[in-house]
């Protein structure tokens, strides 16, 4: 991981970040990450409730994760470094009160520079009132993925989408073509055109994507809150 981060920064990648549960963020690993040039560290906390957290994140220990994250932030700040930016992600569970939401935010900002919230709503609960599920509905959704990123497997296969875990949308392999060639390939251009033309549903992997059915009108909604130092 450290080698990959350093390599990406050496090659001029502007924004290098990764998601983690934080359980393996030891002091040694923290030092290595701080030296690597990493731009952002994103940690999924989901809830500040220990019991609920350990039910959601099986095998993860809440106290260990929180301790690791606090130590990472302290180590970064002791160096006088502005980066990497630390972000904690939480889930807004059904029935959460404004007071609980505020408490989650305050808790998150003791651990990180910014906090992201994602509201959990089961789309099937809103079929009667959500026009996305009505006959003839045409979504205005345009996915940003093929315009902004590439996902690469350990085998070198390339997909235009980080949610394409089975790599059904493979557009090439870096062992056979350069990233520039793949980025400008007909496969990528076709993906972009279908997105711009509002025809993402013609792509098998995309037609049932949660981003398409949930993302363009706020189900789930997401917002971020930054701490006072940023």
Regions picked out by a protein language model, each given a short descriptive name:
Residues 1-110, 114, 118:
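Radical SAM/AdoMet-radical enzyme domain recognition
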Residues 92-96, 116-132, 165-168:
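Flexible glycine/acidic-rich beta-alpha junction loops that bind and position SAM and/or redox cofactors
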Residues 134-139, 194-197:
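Short, P/G- and charge-enriched loop/turn segments at secondary-structure junctions
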């Amino acid at each position: 991981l450290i080698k990959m981060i350093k390599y990406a920064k050496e090659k001029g990648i502007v924004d290098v970040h990764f998601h983690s549960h934080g359980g393996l963020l030891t002091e040694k690993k923290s030092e290595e990450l701080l030296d690597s040039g990493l731009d952002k560290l994103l940690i999924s906390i989901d809830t500040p409730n220990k019991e609920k957290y350990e039910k959601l994140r099986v095998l993860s220990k809440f106290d260990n994760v929180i301790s690791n994250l606090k130590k990472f932030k302290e180590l970064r700040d002791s160096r006088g470094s502005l980066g990497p930016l630390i972000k904690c992600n939480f889930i807004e569970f059904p029935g959460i009160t404004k007071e609980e939401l505020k408490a989650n935010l305050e808790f998150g900002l003791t651990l990180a520079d910014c906090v992201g919230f994602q509201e959990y709503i089961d789309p099937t609960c809103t079929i009667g009132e959500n026009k996305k599920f009505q006959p003839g509905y045409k979504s205005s959704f345009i996915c940003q993925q093929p315009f902004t990123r590439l996902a690469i497997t350990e085998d070198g296969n390339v997909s235009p989408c980080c949610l394409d875990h089975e790599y059904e949308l493979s557009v090439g392999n870096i062992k056979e073509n350069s990233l520039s060639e793949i980025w400008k390939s007909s496969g990528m251009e076709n993906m972009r055109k279908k997105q711009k033309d509002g025809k993402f549903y013609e792509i098998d992997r995309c037609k049932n994507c949660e981003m398409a059915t949930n993302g363009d009108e706020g189900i789930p909604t997401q917002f971020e809150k930054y701490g006072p130092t940023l």
